[in-house]
Amino acid sequence: MDHSMSKKLHDEALLHIVGGVNSPSRSNKGVGGGIPVTMERASGAYFYDVDGNKYIDYLAAFGPIITGHAHPHITEAITKAAQNGVLYGTPTKHEITFAKMLKEAIPSLEKVRFTNSGTEAVMTTIRVARAYTGRDKIIKFAGCYHGHFDLVLVEAGSGPSTLGIPDSAGVTKSTAEEVITVPFNDLASFKEALAVWSDQVAAVLVEPIVGNFGMVAPEDGFLEAVNELAHANGSLVIYDEVITAFRFMYGGAQNYLGVIPDLTAMGKIIGGGLPIGAYGGRVDIMEKVAPLGPAYQAGTHAGNPASILSGIACLEVLQEEGLYERFEKYGSMLKDGIEKAALKHGIAVTVNQIVGALTVYFTEDPVTNYAEAGATNGELFGRFFKGMLEEGINLAPSKYEAWFITSAHSEADILETIQAVDTVFGKMVQDN
């Protein structure tokens, strides 16, 4: 494929934008470098770049585009919002409609509040949990990404009984020491951390199904035990459902798994492609939020008509009968096709697939936590990513990210993708 215009534009972007991109994940650093492809437009399941190349897209903007690009129902809603004014700074009736839709889909959301992003939603749930419990520390799980605010840019110390250390320049040591990080799916480490820091722990922050070191499900009984132990300790449980809400069913991963948190943060899908976040939970906890309570949260663009109407339209599309069964069918087809191609060419892969989301790890071992994901072969993934791009398949540029199937993907797209995987695996073996 010709990428000359993408290269030209990236060179120009480097002169004006830090690193040439507005989010580090777009830089291709995670696949060994190379020029990121600049897209011109997107429609349905397809991307079209500035050089005229067409791709089947599984990036889905890192998750929000579950209905495919430029879905006509969502486009119509956004157009209507633009015509009537995109920002008021006042309440609108649409906020009520959307809040009711979220509550009906995810019953643990007894009250909700809208924000501008998933990062803001998670950040605020922690503040609210602290206000409710009168405690300061949180426990989170290694490798789970919860946004780019200071408190969650923290990595583990030397063990569950030690405090966190900054995972980014600019995060203070004192901030990091408010966080204890333990391995996902490791109940013994969680118990140890809770025992050591017991009456200081305000909340446990967890992705119920991990989406940020690939798709990783909780082991049987893990989330139930986290709930039981946290509540016995007087701590709240916060689910970060920024990736998972409406991903596996019409509702949250909490509905899908049957384990209910005290607070939930959401984003991505619920905006239909526009910036949005939301959080909610038990009434007694949510009443700590201003103007009813002392925990302050506000936003100029929070609940803006454009994002709200886009979100309403997205959820309306997701109510299509049989949609999530189709996601499951196509996800299973991809997993099976990738595994068969890998076996054919003698390449070791592990595919974690949950409904319409999956991750391909270059390893023969199971992946159940961040350490195991980190041990997979990133060099092979980088070659695979670049090979798939040349075959017209757009993936996320990191071994830690997921493939997302959208409502716009067809069975023909899935079969074409499996053929591309077979071709790329063959070339990878040949190149060795």
Swiss-Prot record:
Protein known as: Glutamate-1-semialdehyde 2,1-aminomutase 1
Highest taxon of source: Bacteria
InterPro entries, sorted: 4pyrrol_synth_GluAld_NH2Trfase, Aminotrans_3, Aminotrans_3_PPA_site, PyrdxlP-dep_Trfase, PyrdxlP-dep_Trfase_major, PyrdxlP-dep_Trfase_small
Enzyme kind, highest EC tier: isomerase
Cofactor(s) recorded in Swiss-Prot or TrEMBL: pyridoxal 5'-phosphate
Involved pathway(s): Porphyrin-containing compound metabolism; protoporphyrin-IX biosynthesis; 5-aminolevulinate from L-glutamyl-tRNA(Glu): step 2/2
Single GO term (MF): pyridoxal phosphate binding
A Pfam family assignment: Aminotran_3
Subcellular location: Cytoplasm
EC number from the UniProt entry: 5.4.3.8
Database matches in PROSITE patterns: AA_TRANSFER_CLASS_3
Keywords, comma-separated and alphabetical: Cytoplasm, Isomerase, Porphyrin biosynthesis, Pyridoxal phosphate
Quaternary structure (record): Homodimer.
UniProt record similarity statement: Belongs to the class-III pyridoxal-phosphate-dependent aminotransferase family. HemL subfamily.
Positions of disulphide bridges: none
Reactions this protein catalyses: (S)-4-amino-5-oxopentanoate = 5-aminolevulinate
Gene Ontology CC entries for this record: cytoplasm
GO biological process, one term: protoporphyrinogen IX biosynthetic process
